[in-house]
Amino acid sequence: MTNPEQLKRILSHEVLLKIEMSKNGIVEYANPAFFELIGYEGDLFQCSFYEYLQSDDEHLMKKATDNLFRKSISVAHVFAFLRCNPIRSPNYYIQQAKAPFEGKTYIRMLFRGILVDSLYGKDTRVLWAGKYLYPQRSVINEMDFILFNTLGIGAFILHDHLLGIIKYNYIHVPPPSGKLCSLCEDNLPEWYFEVHSDFCLVWNDLVRRVFAVQQLINCKKLEIEDIVNKLPTGSNHMVEETFLSLPVITVFNGKKNRKQRFRIRSWRSSLNFLVKELDKSIKNFAYLEHRTFLTISNSAAKDMKREIYEKSLVNWEYDFLVPSKIQDYFYDVHSLLLKNLSSKIKLCNHILMYQATFNEVKNFLQTYSLNMLSIEMENIEGSLYFGNAQLSNLICVNQYLSEQRPVFFNRLLALGNVENNNSIYDDIQKRTERISTIKRHKKYFEIGERLTEKDLIVSKTFKTTRIDYFKAVKGSIEDLDVRPLKNRQKFVNKFYASIVHFLTESMQFPSHNDRRFGDNTPHSLDEFILLKEINRGAYGRVYLAKKRSSGKYFALKMIPKSSLDSLKKIKGLLLEKRNMHIQRYGPNTVKLYYAFDSGDYLCLVMDYFNGGDCETLIQKLGPLPEQWVCQYAAELLNAIELLHQDGIIHHDIKPANMLVDETGHIRLTDFGLSENVEEKKEVYKLTKRMSFEQKHGNLYEQLQPKKFEFVRYVRNYRGNIDELEKAESPQQNSDYANDSVQHLLDFDINNMDETAIHMLMNQLEKKENRTFIKKDISGTPNYMAPEILMGVDTQMGDIWAMGCVIFEMLTGTRPFEANTVKAIWARIERNDIGWTKRVKESCSKEAVDLITKLMDPDCNKRLGSNGYQEIKKHPFFRTIKWDNLNSGPGPFVPQTENVEDLTYFEKNISGSDNINKNNCQTSATLILNGIFAFHPPPKATPADSGTETSNSAAFSASEEETTNLTDQKRKDLFSLITKAFKGIDLKALNYNNKATLLRMYDEVDFPKNQQRNKEKFRIQKRPNKKYRYHLF
């Protein structure tokens, strides 16, 4: 049986896989989670889904797919082992297959599949939703296996709630409490929260893709309109415009099954035709915003999909007899319209899967709850249900029907879950017989009521004959008018109307229109209530803010646009947003949720923790106990490891950037100086390796037109960017080889926001020296590694800073203290760590050894250069359990009056001997100081030896090589920054949903039942009959 800790770790990493495949198993579409799991970088290649399954499971998947295409079933369930990349998956949900070969690893999953239409509606595909399934997972004996693995942790909550309904009068049992989904901000019942959050994540991702395509359509329309306005009024001035260079358009009429061909008479008319098609798509998108929602209604989902087909179907094709200058525009527009339709269809298919899952859960829930009632009915006192005639009679009669009770419930309720059951109900009606003689069964009915022949029904289904005994109680069955039943489920709903109503209403099932289509990204500060100022820096302030729609608290960072007066500052801000977005969120990093432009400010919405930071903790408490420091250092190392695995170097690790959350654990923040070096190196290699013509040809072969679409859009802004580059680099030729936006072809672009970020980052780089060794150095002087001062940028600089942080937390002072920045750097170069006799005696030998090895001046010999495991195995961390690092409360749990209490952020500089007011880490370098840059100092001179306040902001301003922007240049640049900056981070919001699941887990009492055998749940298929669960 799975222990609770293992289940807890599983919940925190579980994701929903979505795969669309053709009948022969070719993957036509899959969400990024699938490609990440199998270890493929990207999502554009077509592969065989069967190749990633274990050989034994391949046959089951093909059989289920064939049944779906033959429409013998509507929903299929398959347990299968999916091959995965062990590097991308945590060890605790990877297991070797039964017969491993070539070192491949597999994950056991439950796949749920339905049949969906393809792009043109001609062919059909199977949409599979995959969810991790773990062996030896705790199972509730009375609950259906599929229902359990669908609800996840909610199964335990539902089980406990139904037990309360049975034990007490259901009228007096409150409905399940609700939890707020961070993605959609809807309140969902706890038992359904995991199902909803999985589907909600995919739904939001698909919505973002629809928005991204629509943005490209808007840009393309503006571009073509601009070209039309620049065309001369007559065709005499255009020598290239010939009869053969005009497009031939083929229009298909689906209703009459005809097609019409015609040639457009001029280039102007041709471009106007494209503008008209784009305008039609824009109007349809406006309709979609008011129509599409995540629905549980099957009819609503199908109607929605049909309307999208009718309004967005691309019913025309084009052809050119000779190459033409406008040929690319036709290719771009036609590709965009197809992509627009494809993204909407994927969204509708996902809604159909959500609807199928919802109905499946609902049917299983009714069966499970009623079976559960039948099991527990013998121990219920009838007096608890006084006033409810149906339940009272049922409880009374149940004592006399104990022998036939399983037959009654199992036979009756099984029919409610048969898909497409109209034919079966007709068969039941034909096979139902009346029995005139009931004396032989009189021994089962002791109450003395007069029975009629309609009290007994012989049901002959699935070639079996069973006698279901119904007790006729006055005021219940006879009043319900039980005739030869045309629909058994109708009888169930009538006989247990109050229970069914309770399950569907009081259990707070989601409504039909709980999720409207739209972008949830905030658009202005009006969506937040600014409560208190948390901190301020050189270029902005951080406020405690409350979101009006959800009531959640966030830290809102506001950066005035007027403060971004140089390219370096703009680059630092975009890097902060970019690196917070691409990191894999762990329990020890601050998450970024939203970024938006609000008039005069650029805003970042992040995690809020009111426990203060470690710098304030050291100020108020002095040197921290070694047990505290050991836990804090381990959590800091965990955060650094995750960042480095994503190629992110933090550059500014210090106690002021280590926040304390409400449970006492560390959260690393402030990514203003961070940089993704690995990504830049890869981009540089791609740019140098391939010429523009090679890239152009390869991309056409790979059918990736979306990159060209955005490149042409970006070229509209090229003039503005080139003006900015003139201040930094010599004039370049304007040929294709030096095209300032050609590098965009090197990227895998999923939406325009990501593309704009790449483009801006590249434009803000120095053009005259294309190297990735930084000329300047970033960070806070006291925590800089020696190689950073030499201009060498490595990940080991963060490890050095970690050693400095451990030293400061243990001693209350920094390892390199001085009155000036230059003096600090001189001590760093000499490796003059502040090891006084008193300091060494106050630390353990293990702590001294760890700090010394972490601060080795040679980065190649520094502890951790051979992997982070050698740091974790150091004796200083011997008491740390790395698998359960963040379980339980931390060393110091903040005690605040309420969420808005900011007591722990109050500095106490005057009352502490450990913090020098004139030291190099002043308030100017705290949380908002994300764009300072420091350069190696020149050799000391007598004039430099005097006292100096050494404010890092003043030092940076005097030495920084900045390019000040004029008002016009800033205006032009901000037009691109707005597109690159705003966005919503689904990964961070989903992480919050997982945290909610973990808190729900902590409140669950896990049953100690024996694990049910998988084979026990295989329903034997009866020849030529539809069976209940379709489980393979």
From Swiss-Prot:
Q: What domain of life does the native source organism fall in?
A: Eukaryota
Task: Give the catalysed reaction(s), semicolon-separated.
Answer: L-seryl-[protein] + ATP = O-phospho-L-seryl-[protein] + ADP + H(+); L-threonyl-[protein] + ATP = O-phospho-L-threonyl-[protein] + ADP + H(+)
Taking every annotated instance into account, which residue ranges of this chain make up the domain Protein kinase?
528-877
Q: Which keywords has UniProt assigned to this entry?
A: ATP-binding, Cytoplasm, Kinase, Meiosis, Nucleotide-binding, Serine/threonine-protein kinase, Transferase
Listed binding positions for ATP are 534-542, 557
Q: Per its database record, what is this protein's job?
A: Has a role in meiosis.
Listed name of the protein: Serine/threonine-protein kinase ppk31
- Origin organism of this chain? Schizosaccharomyces pombe (strain 972 / ATCC 24843) (Fission yeast)
The lineage is: Eukaryota, Fungi, Dikarya, Ascomycota, Taphrinomycotina
What is the name of the gene encoding this protein? ppk31
